[in-house]
Amino acid sequence: MQIGNTSFRRYGIGKVLYELYTKFTYFLPILVSNYKFRHLLLLPLYKEKAAANYYPGGNKKVIYMVINESTFSGGLSDRLRAIVSVYQECKRQGLDFYINFETPNLIDYLQPNEYDWRITEDEICYDPKECYPCTILTYHTDIKDPYQRFVQRTLLRHFLKKRYRQIHVYSNMVTSDAVYGKLFKELFRPTDDLQKLIDYHLKQIGGRNNYISCTFRFRQLLGDFKEGGDMLLKEEKEKYIQRCLVTVVHLHEQYPGECILITSDSNTFLKRVSTLDNIYVIPGKVVHIGFTYNADRQVYMKSFVDYYMLSYARIVFLVRDKLMYHSGFPYRAALLNDAEYLEIMLSQ
């Protein structure tokens, strides 16, 4: 009998073996990646930095880390959900929590709200004898899977128990939907520059909860975004764009009179969709923060504006098909201010 057989995994020894198999497949990739990234990337990098770094000591610190070399942590929403997850556990244990987020420099866009998470470079220890860098990555696509959250939380608690002065966490681990918005707001509020842009666009579009949003996540399909994934042939791109435009038209038919905020990683598509009636597009170029380290501050700013503007929509839609990426960005934004979230299939 195969372990994937439904009858086999429901009863007796089959049930026991299936549970062990399931636990193994959740824990193993996270542990293997932690070993790999620690020994092949982080520890050699830390040894180089330790030679030029003096650490003054102090209380045990837990630091969520983003450095240019840590592309494995994913995009903006992946990192924000992990920050909230690590903060939640530190709050539960009474541990000091900090964020070191390079490229973009997080403090240019989000500032501390109720909890001060700022830390300076000279407060960060890179001596492997004093600090423990670790990774907790997400390998199962179902981010709502409670067992995945359990496994990641268990490993985080294991790492936090280690007897080092600092624990550096590199992660895109998932968090509980129920607490995300609350904990995010404890940590963050927009900087003055970001808030001005949010206020401007809210005024232009009609205010909070007076519009709906629709997100298209193409990756490299249209050939104008730096990330992984397939690229459509030239003759296929126009047909695909037309299908996307028809999807927006159908959405207008379902919600007549509603202004639709369109967000996307494709400037090509944003230019095309902006010609439709009652469409709002936030100007600016979009980049993936895991693949772009040298963009202008205002380029990174657009991702944060998009995030907040999605959160203030009445309904947040994500367009899906077998080619487009199942982005967590609009879903996480919807959680921020309790917007309704729906996924719709691309028109044929």
Name each region found by the language model.
Residues V84, M301-Q348:
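A donor-sugar binding/catalytic signature common to diverse glycosyltransferases
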Residues L95, P256-E258, N337-L342:
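A short helix->loop->beta-strand "cap" motif at the edges of active sites that frequently abuts
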Residues L110-E121, T268-I279, P330-L335:
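Short, aromatic/basic amphipathic alpha-helical patches
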